[in-house]
Design a protein with these regions (language model features):
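Hydrophobic core of transmembrane alpha-helices in multi-pass small-molecule transporters
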Residues: 20, 89, 100-116, 236, ...
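Helix-loop-helix hairpin linking two adjacent transmembrane segments in secondary transporters
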Residues: 144-193
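Extracytoplasmic gate region of multi-pass secondary transporters
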Residues: 26, 30-37, 220-281
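Cytoplasmic helix-loop-helix junction between adjacent transmembrane helices
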Residues: 106-142
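Cytoplasmic membrane-interface "Motif A"-like loop-to-helix N-cap segments
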Residues: 71-83, 287-298
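Extracytoplasmic
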Residues: 10-45, 62-66, 151-152, 243-250
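Helix-to-loop junctions at the C-terminal end of transmembrane segments
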Residues: 62-75, 277-289
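C-terminal ends and interior cores of transmembrane alpha-helices
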Residues: 84-97, 300-313
Length: 334
């Protein structure tokens, strides 16, 4: 692990920052401002959830094509474009007054933040650090956990200080000011790494024509494979339930009479579970492979759902339900 960090710290830090600053497009970030957004746009909980779901679904459909850009565009240029796209989404949401601008703003946040920035980070780790893909993906993915630990408290403080609209604008400015120079520095000389990857890829494909586990699959091949459809329910149920819970967290806090500021401060406990899960799963993936872990992915989340109705205090809700939920959460695994 230490050798990996010493030799590949630039690429690992790039992946970490991409996941960390994907926060404005993540549900935990947007939902903390949902009360103010609903009030400004005169939407109920259900109506805002419908808008959010529609924008997220549109983003998922577009990802079928936009996700392929990672294979076609220079990583440095693409990453900078994603940062600006996310910043534009923050700007549009900050001035939204109706359904159209709200949908557009949320769509851009979900597409560039939750979708492409996170996907770019994970793809870079797996693609260029193949022999340490588990540990590298875990280290880069820790950006999400750290973001979850500190962003809610910062966002709540920013909300109380400058209001929700200015909070989005401040987020956009900081996003560009920090990420653009960081990407230019951390991916300096990346072209040589990518050329080496292409050379190795062509050699592997030529040697593994009869081995479906090693060669690169095309999209039509994946769609025709029956095991893909058996895997989809387990894979999609986790983000579906997790996003639904996080999206309505403000409503849950209000319903149970808890303090939003205390709730936000307890995200750090949640993040610690995420970090631990990432590190353990990273080692397991590198040692045993990802396939043996698949049958166990949804079990902790199922236990957490059983315990949710009996969590009476904010502390035990975080300790039991959210910790178990996050073990199954796809963002906590390589």
């Amino acid at each position: 692990m230490l050798h990996l960090i010493r030799t590949e710290w630039r690429l690992l830090l790039f992946g970490f920052l991409m996941t960390f600053f994907s926060a404005p497009g993540q549900t935990f970030f947007i939902s903390l401002l949902s009360g103010e957004i609903r009030q400004a746009t005169h939407l109920s909980d259900g109506e805002f959830a419908a808008v959010y779901s529609f924008a997220t679904l549109c983003s998922a459909v577009v990802m079928i094509w936009s996700g392929a850009l990672i294979d076609k565009i220079n990583l440095q240029k693409l990453s900078i474009a994603l940062v600006f796209g996310l910043a534009v989404g923050c700007g549009i949401l900050s001035i939204s007054t109706g359904i159209v601008s709200l949908v557009l703003g949320v769509f851009l946040l979900r597409q560039f933040g939750q979708g492409l920035m996170y996907l770019t980070s994970a793809t870079a780790m797996v693609r260029y650090l193949e022999h340490n893909r588990g540990k590298s993906t875990a280290l880069a993915g820790m950006g999400y956990a750290v973001s979850e630990a500190i962003m809610p408290s910062i966002l709540v403080a920013l909300l109380l200080w400058v209001g929700w609209r200015n909070s989005w604008q401040v987020t956009a400015v900081f996003l560009i000011a920090i990420m653009v120079p960081a990407i230019l520095y951390l991916l300096r000389g990346h072209r040589q790494r990518h050329d080496l990857y292409l050379t190795q890829l062509s050699e592997v494909d030529s040697q593994s024509l009869g081995n479906p586990l090693k060669r690169q699959w095309t999209r039509p091949e994946v769609i025709r494979d029956k095991f893909f459809y058996l895997f989809i329910p387990a894979l999609t149920s986790q983000p579906l339930m997790f996003t639904g819970f996080i999206f309505h967290q403000v409503h849950l806090v209000e319903t149970k009479g808890w303090s939003l500021s205390v709730w936000a401060s307890l995200f750090i406990m949640y993040a610690l579970v995420s970090v631990g899960t990432k590190m353990v799963s990273g080692f397991l993936v590198d040692r045993y492979g990802a396939i043996p872990m698949v049958p166990w992915l949804s079990l902790p989340m199922g236990v957490g759902l059983v315990l949710l109705p009996v969590t009476l205090t904010i502390f035990w809700e975080v300790v039991f339900f959210r910790s178990l939920f996050h073990i199954s959460d796809p963002t906590s695994r390589p």
